[in-house]
Every structure is written in C-alpha cells, then in structure tokens.
Amino acid sequence: MRRWHRKDLLVMALGPFAMLEGGATHTDPGTPRNHAATATEVHRTVAHDRSAPLGARSSARSSAPMHHRVLPIARRVASRRPSPGDVEQTIPGDRAPATIVASFDGLGVGFGGPQGTANFRNPSDNSLAVGPDHIVQIVNSRMAIFTKKGARYDTTGRALYGPVETRNVFRGFGGPCERRNNGDAVVRFDQLANRWLIVMPIFSRITDQDDARGAPRDGEPARRSVVGVPGQPGAAARLYQPPPPPPDSQPPVRDSTRPRPPQPPTGVYAMCYALSTGADPLGSYYRYEFVRPLFPDYPRPAVWPDGYYVPTSTGDEVIQKHACVVDRAKMLVGADATEQCVVIDGVNFLNNADVDGTAVPPRGAPNIMMAAGGTQLHKMMEDSVILAWSFHVDWRDPAKTRVDGPRRIPVAPYHYLCDGQLTDCVPQPGAERHLDAQGDKLMARLVYRRVGGHESIVAVHSVNTKAGGGGVRWYEFRLDRRREPVLYQQGTYAPDGAFRWMASAAMDKNGNIGIGYSYGGAGDFVGQRFAGRLASDPLGRLTVREAVLATGEAAQTNTLRWEDYTQTAVDPSDDCTIWYVGDYFRRGASSYSTRIGAFRLPGCSGAR
C-alpha cells in the first residue's frame, strides 16, 4: 500500500490547471500499473455565480390520473441455500416481491413536457435524483423535473419542466458550461443539505479565447457574473423541433462504439457544477466551472460530508482514472471553491461512496473509493478481489491530502460479463444486434449507509453465470475500526439463464438492500426489474423476488450501447422508498423510453 503525503509535491494552480511533479499523463495501455495515486492537483474556480430561478415555481395540484404499465410478478418458487463456497443464486427468493408504489415513463420516446419533445442520444446515461417534492431526471444531454406526491403535489410523475438541454442550468453563466451541451451529466440530491447537485462534463478541449477564460491568478478571486441578468435561467425556451422524418425512416444515430478521434494536444477540459440554493430544483443555483487537464468521461458524483467526490475516466483507450473532490462546504454557501484531484493508473472505473440517509460517517472520516479488479485493456477479464482506497482530503492544507491504497479485498472469483465493455453481449429476440454490458466496472452507485452499530458499503457489477447468461454480483462491505472495508456478504443473482446486468443498488434505513437492473435475453426483449433482501435474511441471498417495472416490447437495433448505467435513489421523505430508472423499447419504436419506478421493501415504512 502506497501513501502520498509529501508537502513538496504540491503545486497550487496558477494557470488553467496545476500538474504536480510526476503528474497525470495518458498512460500506455500496455504498461501495467500498481493502482497507486499520483500527488494532488489543486484546481481553482474559473468562474462561479448564483443564477436566477431555473423556471417558474409551480405549486399547482393536478387531479389528472396517472397511467402506469405495471407488469405481472413471477410466481413463487421454493427457497434453497446456495451450495457451500458457491455464491451464485440460481433460484428466486422466497419472499414476495417488493411493493411498486410508483411507476411512470420519463424522458425518451413518447415523452412530452412543458417544453415539448426532443430527440435523445444513445446511450441514455440515465441519472435520477429524488427530493421532498420533486424528481429530477437527466438522460444523456436532456433533463426534466417531475412532481412527487406528498405535501406539495397530489400526483407523481407530472412533468413541470423539460425536456431541455442540461446546459440550460448554465444559461447566462458564459464559457463552455453554457455553450456546450455534452452528455454524461449526472444529478444527485444531497439529503444532508436538501440541495440538488448537477455535474456536467465538457468533452471537447477548450481552445478558443471565448471559452478559455483561464483560472484566476494567485490572489485573484474567481470571476463572478451578475445575479439575475437577462439571459440567465428563467422560463425555459422551447427546444428546436426538427420536422418529422418520412415514414419508415429512422433518425441517424452516431456510432458511439467507434473510438473518438484523437484530440489536439492543446487546451484543457472543464467540469461544470450547479448546486441548488434550496430544496426546490426550479429555484436558483450556485454555478461553478473548473478546468481539468484530462478527458472527464463517465462522471459518477457521490455525496460525502467533506466534499462532492466525482471520479472520471480519461477515455476508453487508456487505463487511467481521475479521482476528484470539490469543496462542498464552500459550494453550499456559494463561496469561491477549489477542486482537488489525483490520477490512478492501471485501474478500472472508480466509484466513490455515496451517502444514503442522514446518519453521517464520523467527522473527518475518509471517503471510500472502489473498483473491480482485472483490466480489459490488458485482457485480464477475471479476478477475485475488489480494490479499495481511502481518500483523505484536507481543504486547509492540500499538501496533506492523500489517497491510501489500494487494499485488495478477497471476494468470490468473477469474470466480466461478456469480457467487459463495448462487446456484443446480450441477445435480443429476432434481432442480430446484441447489446453491450459494461461488464468491466462497478456500477453507480457505491452506496454508504450507517445503520445500527455498523457502516455498510454496497457495490454491484455484471458477471458471467454458469448457465451462460448474465448475473448481478453484489457485495456488502462493512468498515472495521481502522475504517477499512471488509467483506460481510456477497452473491450473484442468476435465478435462470437470462441476462441481468447494468444494476444499481440502494440500502434503506433498516439496512435492507434493493437492486434494480436490466433484464433480457434471447427469449425476452430488454426491460427493467428489481429484487432485494432484508437485513435479517440469510447472508448472500436476494430473498425478495423480482418485481417487473417495465417489459420490453421491441429490440434495439441501431446501436449496441445500452444505457451505460442505471441509477437508484432513496426517497428522503421516508428513507425507505427506493427509486430506480432504466430503459425499455416500446413496440415499433426506433429509440428507447425510460421507466421511473419506486419500490418499498417489506417492513420499511413511515417518515424518517
């Protein structure tokens, strides 16, 4: 285990970004690395402000009925324990399925909102967050805001805002955050502060003078825009609507499986943050732009008391990940903030622990970061460990920031589903096109929950199964007295020969685990399902049988990319209800629809 804790390595950012001695460069994929972190980069705020309200605040109550297409539940099957030493669960659980308490279609084919309709990019890159009264969804480069039944609204799933480009949150901010509408934007609800966090990466290098504002010089405050000037977010403008395509034609789809063209060696990238000033996502936002030296792909934000942690990949052709954290305390009050990053070579996609609930880690506790073992670019498709790091951030003295690890946690052997990402994997009925599985990575979210006298971390990824399908490998780790994760239980959910993959997990206030995932195969079009377990159940089993959220009605034939990720969110109103979003195809559709659903596991109810 290597520890970086050397003051002489720190260089404060005086230009667009600061790279430390021995800092981050793109790594030759043929050169194995030891997964240790580089020294810390410190990024100053390029610009920040407080926006005008995003849209008109609406408290209107709707009595219009909601139509949910909820599908039948699988029949009850007798329970058997897995054989000793075998973590693959080949039969369903013996408990009734989780109760579906809400279900409606989100962004995608068939969606219409106050700003009309839109075309949606592939993959969907689904992101979902849930607050006291609202649900916010982002699909690749579009966003929408929905009602949530409760004190303010009498119905769930009514669109209040959208579909709009995600960059609409940055209208009036200037620079690349306003000008460029890239995909992979992600939303989180910070339950500890009742705020909404939107993170949007900028994928193209910033080279023109209009975009490249540069970071502040030493001693110079971050640039601020005037609050509420014309052109800042107000009522959203209707998106341009192209004319309808001729009959029997399909819209052009960019082949996202082809490698991106090489970027010029000049210019930097940017990461854009918007943090709401209150619990209403239609209100104003504190907005920030940071520049980064490395390509900021696939961000996976996580809420932790001392920061918002946002790891990113640096591209599909390199084995190098950027692990960053931004100063949450400063951002919550709209103050000038910094971002600290390290580079970790030779590792798969990283995920940082994301807090579920309001029971926080002990003061000063480091954030836990994890990745699957193996490396697809080295053709290492299997392993028997999960890698873990401890990220200690020091905002007063960044020289003391360090990332300890990796710790290699032994787990049951696994093989990446279909050998990793961008592979022809999941078959579909009557179609030659197979779908991608993203089998090389732990999926968002990496869940942290403090319940009772212990602290748990839940992780999921997609693995091959004995029957030749795909299964959801899941883990619960617990932190020991040294704050190191130790395996508590694990399992692979594969009750038949179908494919279950692209999972996302959550843990409710009772310590119950719920997992949503895509389901499909040669006999079934891809849809969305949900399974789980109670904290008191036998270890290593998902005892709560599958609930069906959405059943696919057609095959996706225009691209192999499927979702890239799904997402869960725990409802802050009761700390029990688990929300989930994923894709499915309607009959005759040429692109995806998304289904948003809410589940409640047995025995968890009531306000927190």
Q: What is the meaning of each model-derived region?
A:
Residues 2-10:
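Bacterial N-terminal signal peptides that target proteins for export
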Residues 11-19:
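Bacterial N-terminal signal peptides
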Residues 15, 235-236:
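N-terminal leader/targeting segments
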Residues 25-232, 240-246, 251-608:
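C-terminal PAP-associated
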